[in-house]
Amino acid sequence: LATSEGDRDLAQNLTNGVLGKLSSQGFGTENPPSVEDIQDMVESTLIEQGHSEIAKSYILYRHERRKIRDEKMKVLNTKVLDPVSKEFDLNCLRVLASRYLFRNNKNEITESPTQLFERVAVLITIGDLLHDSSIFNPTGNTPQNIEEAQEYLTKLDQFNYKFKIDEYYLNQYHFRGLVNGYIDIAQKGQAKISFKDLLTKLAAKEFTDYGARITEYYNLMVNQVFLPNSPTMMNAGGRLGQLSACFVLGMPDDMGKIMKTTSDAALIFKSGGGVGINYSELREEGDIVASTSGVASGPVSFMNIINTVTDVIKQGGKRRGANMGIMDVSHPDIEKFITNKTEPGVLENFNVSVGVWGDFWSALVDSEDGAYTLRSTRDGSPVREINAHHLIDLIATSAWKSAEPGLIFFDIINKYNVFAKARGGPLRATNPCGEQSLYPYESCNLGSINLANLTKRTADGQYEFDWQKYEEIV
């Protein structure tokens, strides 16, 4: 193709020449040639048969490929490329090396991309294995000795690569996931067998069928059809073991609880997660603090604390943290909140959003004067009135200047919230990107399906979306 000398007969003759050389030099089933061996013979065959232009292009191609291989080995700090590294392009490997591959205390990469995807696939499959019909009883009411299982958590190093699922070994952190997963179902009375019996079954290779499940998950990832979230890539099969990307925390109007939330946020950032918080419970700036007879600094000041913590703690040593800061539209400090990010350098680790309820829309659309009441966070009493049209204009202007704030339609979200009664109140916060509404101390586990890889070519040469493959992946 590079020399515009495409010819099927020529290609066949060259192939026969290469095969003849391989055979004459003793290569075969018992002594397979390397890629370099084959490429050397292709090169010499082209020259011997007088195809100098094709040989020149092939030599240049090999040179470029060698440069890419050398750069890949440099990025991965290795002398040999594993199968995934050969297939992934250089930019993909740079991302894996900078974010996801395990490193030692000297910051040296200690695993290959193949090992990364295997450790992730193994941990995901452990969850499936624990729901095997020989282990899991969905109706519950089966008591087990949970303390016996918990004992294994004190001696994890004794079980590093001791068990395997088919051909895939469990490291000590996979084993920890197995123990914790078992404890979770046992506490609900859903474990049919003891943990010791589970290990007996595992040692007897009764769960080898799940090796195919591991391979399936592995192939989805290495074929770049599906990828889990970053914390899963960073932590699955590792010491931290934290797989969730997004959390929501509460922010009560109490100094001790504020500091507890700050501490929890720091731990989440450390493990690679992000946080959404509704700051509306915090009293407005200037309100009296009874315990000190002082005045409150307001919600925005506490957002600055979380912002600083985010700045200082790089997520899992890999990336900056992310926050969603929310304030209800009825909060007395709402104007300051809306305009806070119009200046550069303010709350750079935050997305901010105004939480809007039905009474605001009524004031904006239905009332003649647009009067809207801002209320005390302590007792709900009126603090002052503001024009709803002024607020919506302020939101629009600030969003035009700085792309902040967004709007969260809590009236619509809670219209379809089936958990309000069970959780004792409405949803009032979302994860950092805003796509998942959550209650405090809930998390969401995200993943991505690569739709571009789900197209197929039809008999007439056109392309269409492969709905069947999409359904299988989901």
Where are these regions (language model features)?
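Extended catalytic cores of very large enzyme megasubunits
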Residues: 1-474
